[in-house]
């Protein structure tokens, strides 16, 4: 499952370093950890941001990987 997907950040807690992305195709929300964010600066996301990502199998189920902010 390495296909690129597009989604909108549903919520992200910068203090805890995780949140969820809602894929635009209507599939189930995907967990995202700050370490998956591809950014040289502070790795955080904001509600409503458009992102592209792939999905990997995490320890507790599907998780976003290679998250790139596109807006």
Swiss-Prot record:
Keywords: Activator, Cytoplasm, DNA-binding, Stress response, Transcription, Transcription regulation. SMART domains: CSP. Its main location: cytoplasm. It is found in: Cytoplasm. Residues 7-67 form the CSD domain. PANTHER family: COLD SHOCK DOMAIN CONTAINING PROTEINS. This is Cold shock-like protein CspB. It comes from Escherichia coli (strain K12).
């Amino acid at each position: 499952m390495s296909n690129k997907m597009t989604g909108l950040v549903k919520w992200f807690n910068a203090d805890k370093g995780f949140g969820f992305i809602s894929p635009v195709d209507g599939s189930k929300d995907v967990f995202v950890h700050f370490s998956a964010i591809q950014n040289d600066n502070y790795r955080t996301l904001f509600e409503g941001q458009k992102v592209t990502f792939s999905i990997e199998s995490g320890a507790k189920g599907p998780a976003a990987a290679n998250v790139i902010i596109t807006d």
